[in-house]
A protein has these predicted regions:
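Short alpha-helical segments that sit at the start of domains
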Residues: 9-38
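Short amphipathic alpha-helical interaction segments
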Residues: 60-75
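Short acidic, hydrophobic short linear motifs in intrinsically disordered regions
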Residues: 45-57
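Short, cationic-aromatic polyanion-contact patches
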Residues: 84-107
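Amphipathic alpha-helical dimerization/coiled-coil segments
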Residues: 18, 104-115
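A short, conserved structural fragment
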Residues: 74-84
Length: 115
């Protein structure tokens, strides 16, 4: 029972912060959350992730819907796009510094959650 209570308290705390952070945006749908995990995984492993690769990796999400979610994440300041010097058409998606800090805090909180 304590595990369930801890998880519930964690979730409620996260949702209270939703108007001030990325919590609400990335919990809108499984696709939003999956996108966050894909971008952050690439970032943490120092891998390049192109917008096209991200669209392909998002399961059960159409390419137009993926493009909309990516655009929203960029507009809200969670991610930014970088062009390569070799091919100006290819854009890599990267988290902003502020989002990296938010994500790191989220992971620390999850790790400290005693289940």
């Amino acid at each position: 029972m304590k595990d369930t209570k801890n998880l519930l308290e964690f979730w409620e705390t996260q949702m209270k912060q939703s108007h001030r952070s990325s919590n609400y945006f990335f919990r809108k749908s499984p696709s939003h959350y999956h996108m966050m995990l894909l971008v952050m995984s690439a970032h943490k492993h120092e891998q390049e992730l192109s917008v096209e690769e991200l669209k392909t990796k998002l399961f059960k999400t159409s390419r137009p819907k993926s493009a909309i979610i990516i655009t929203e994440a960029v507009e809200k300041g969670f991610f930014h796009l970088e062009k390569t010097s070799i091919d100006q058409r290819k854009k890599f998606i990267k988290p902003t510094n502020s989002f990296v800090k938010e994500f790191d805090n989220y992971i620390i909180t999850l790790k400290n959650l005693v289940l």
